[in-house]
Amino acid sequence: MMNPWIDISQRLDEHIPVWPGDTPFSYRTRWNKAESGSVNVGQITMSTHTGTHIDAPFHFDNEGKRVIDLDLNIYIGPARVIHLSNPKKIGIDELQTIDLHGVTRLLIYTGAWTNRTTFPETIPYIDPPLAPYLKKYGVRLIGIDLPSVDPLTSKQLPAHHELHRCGIHILEGLVLDHVSPGDYELAALPLPLVNADGSPVRAALRKMG
């Protein structure tokens, strides 16, 4: 019997926090059965960076790829989940004891965003020198349980740019509280948004072995 899939996505409703100033999430029934005679039809309004989502390079680089141009293979396949104990930053020192050999997709639990009904004021961030360190091991995707890989006040977004330079894609806003460290199969496909800078995903893990 295969292991069950574990949902690691944030639930999307009107209570989900968004970046200050960004588009709030809303869902409403635009057309109900009484009006249509047959079906309910809903309408969603949201940012491309609400909840669990991927960043396309166009998010931080005007010349970068859009969501539709991304290789779907990046978001499906073996992944390693690691736990860090509420670090101030996520850098080489924090990962030195972690075996990364053969890891293509690295998902990091920090436990730093405990109340997901409010947007955090500060978060641990990816230290840019970590990017070439991960590239050396062949990592192509990094996922975190935070809304960004950079400090929330950053305008230069050094981690975004350095990860991109090293060919490492970004998955943000994961829910990993209920996931033990180890090796899993990941599925976190973006929507086929032609011009978008990011996309919500339904991310899930299945224990390997």
From Swiss-Prot:
<comment type="similarity">
    <text>Belongs to the Cyclase 1 superfamily. KynB family.</text>
</comment>
<dbReference type="Pfam" id="PF04199">
    <property type="entry name" value="Cyclase"/>
</dbReference>
<dbReference type="InterPro" id="IPR007325">
    <property type="entry name" value="KFase/CYL"/>
</dbReference>
<dbReference type="InterPro" id="IPR017484">
    <property type="entry name" value="Kynurenine_formamidase_bac"/>
</dbReference>
<feature type="binding site">
    <location>
        <position position="172"/>
    </location>
    <ligand>
        <name>Zn(2+) 2</name>
    </ligand>
</feature>
<keyword id="KW-0823">Tryptophan catabolism</keyword>
<dbReference type="GO" id="GO:0008270">
    <property type="term" value="F:zinc ion binding"/>
</dbReference>
<comment type="subunit">
    <text>Homodimer.</text>
</comment>
<feature type="active site" description="Proton donor/acceptor">
    <location>
        <position position="59"/>
    </location>
</feature>
<dbReference type="GO" id="GO:0004061">
    <property type="term" value="F:arylformamidase activity"/>
</dbReference>
<feature type="binding site">
    <location>
        <position position="19"/>
    </location>
    <ligand>
        <name>substrate</name>
    </ligand>
</feature>
<feature type="binding site">
    <location>
        <position position="53"/>
    </location>
    <ligand>
        <name>Zn(2+) 1</name>
    </ligand>
</feature>
<dbReference type="GO" id="GO:0019441">
    <property type="term" value="P:L-tryptophan catabolic process to kynurenine"/>
</dbReference>
<feature type="binding site">
    <location>
        <position position="49"/>
    </location>
    <ligand>
        <name>Zn(2+) 1</name>
    </ligand>
</feature>
<dbReference type="InterPro" id="IPR037175">
    <property type="entry name" value="KFase_sf"/>
</dbReference>
<keyword id="KW-0378">Hydrolase</keyword>
<keyword id="KW-0862">Zinc</keyword>
<comment type="function">
    <text>Catalyzes the hydrolysis of N-formyl-L-kynurenine to L-kynurenine, the second step in the kynurenine pathway of tryptophan degradation.</text>
</comment>
<dbReference type="GO" id="GO:0004328">
    <property type="term" value="F:formamidase activity"/>
</dbReference>
<keyword id="KW-0479">Metal-binding</keyword>
<feature type="binding site">
    <location>
        <position position="55"/>
    </location>
    <ligand>
        <name>Zn(2+) 1</name>
    </ligand>
</feature>
<protein>
    <recommendedName>
        <fullName>Kynurenine formamidase</fullName>
        <ecNumber>3.5.1.9</ecNumber>
    </recommendedName>
</protein>
<comment type="pathway">
    <text>Amino-acid degradation; L-tryptophan degradation via kynurenine pathway; L-kynurenine from L-tryptophan: step 2/2.</text>
</comment>
<feature type="binding site">
    <location>
        <position position="172"/>
    </location>
    <ligand>
        <name>Zn(2+) 1</name>
    </ligand>
</feature>
<feature type="binding site">
    <location>
        <position position="160"/>
    </location>
    <ligand>
        <name>Zn(2+) 2</name>
    </ligand>
</feature>
<dbReference type="GO" id="GO:0043420">
    <property type="term" value="P:anthranilate metabolic process"/>
</dbReference>
<feature type="binding site">
    <location>
        <position position="55"/>
    </location>
    <ligand>
        <name>Zn(2+) 2</name>
    </ligand>
</feature>
